[in-house]
Amino acid sequence: FAMLNASGCNIGNFAMPFAQGFLGPVGVIAVSLFDCGNSMICLGGAYSIASIVKSGDGKFRIKPILNNLVHSIPLMTYIFMTILGLLHLSLPAPVVEFAGIVGNANAFMAMLMIGVGFHLNGDPSQIGDIIKILGVRYIIGIALALAAYFILPLPLEYRQALVIVFLAPVASANPPFTAQMGSDFGLASAINSVSIIASIVLITTALVIML
């Protein structure tokens, strides 16, 4: 459960708007490049590994991981569009227009799903789990953000973009994958919601300092 719900970064619904608003085209490119690897984790990678760990047989098998990745429609769509981009091909205008209409509902549907699933029963252990999982997540995230900003020999805009993505909330796909794995969907939604609030504070503070 912790492995799945501490992984991934919410790029499209969260980090990208910050990059567009404050960092401009270079920041958007940097965030998009980061999301190429991030999507592999968010859209099936973390779920596959967490499922293997939950099974408890102690055997690491690559076939189930690849099987889950291949059957992940969002990931396959992402890869398909990346290939089209590399080949300098584009979809017909009506398809792009329709996809844009559907895509505009993505953020709303993600937040609706998290809101519907949000459930805390008042058990102190749940609060403890949230603090423990997000504590580890943000300690690592802050350390990576500091390292990226002060150590990496990259242009300033790229380092600023990395700070944003490392401080981003956990992936919005985590709760449905948690439910699919048979774990606590309500707690996963609560972790996701709290991480959004924490990331707003952290990223806003970071932008004030960096800009």
List each language-model region with its residue ranges:
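Alpha-helical transmembrane segments of multi-pass small-molecule/ion transporters
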Residues: F1-L211
